[in-house]
Amino acid sequence: MELLSLENASRHYGKKSQITALDDFSVRIEEGEMLALMGKSGSGKSTVLNIISGIDESDSGTYCFGGEDISRKKGDAMTMFRRKNIGIVMQHFALVDDMDCFENIALPLRLARVNKKEISRRVNEVAQKLDITSKLKKLPKELSGGEAQRVAIARAIISEPKLILADEPTGALDEENSARIMDIFKQLNESGITLLIVTHDPGVAAKCKRTIWIKDGRNAGMEE
């Protein structure tokens, strides 16, 4: 079953739209799939993630998620859609420096006004799953790179999203921690979560079901 489709999307920047980030780009992702998006720096990978997450919008094309036309959503409606359906994992973790790990993980639930008892239950549950229970009272600066990324993943999945968008999630990690993060993604995928992983690492892409290539904002091939 198809979870999302981005069809013929284009995105231009600059006063006269002279910078092309996406040019008639399309991607379809099946529910329960783990897909890699590969391309060089500046090829448009992050723009694809920003459009799918609703952080940005395309100038043309259509975007459907779960059979619903998301292209029409704006403002608060798009924010609510993102909070309900999508978790985001960044290369450099994007944790709040002055919040301990418990509060970083709990942040999406607090924004959704979930009660304190349920927040505590869910944070401790996901922390146990990712082996970071002992880190919950630590600040991000006290963590290793691998630990920080596991906290970021915990925050991304705490709202039980249908889709995880991961932007170079192993790019700042050593080989051992990269392998551990990919094992976590595999487990999440096996539990039913769909993942789209932006990467430049062929080893990461090899662990995904499919790889979509992007070059100069355009589709440049697919590997299975």
Kindly give the residue locations of the regions a language model identified.
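ABC family nucleotide-binding domain
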Residues: L3-L4, A9-I214
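H-loop (His-switch) and adjacent beta-strand-loop-beta switch element
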Residues: T211-E224
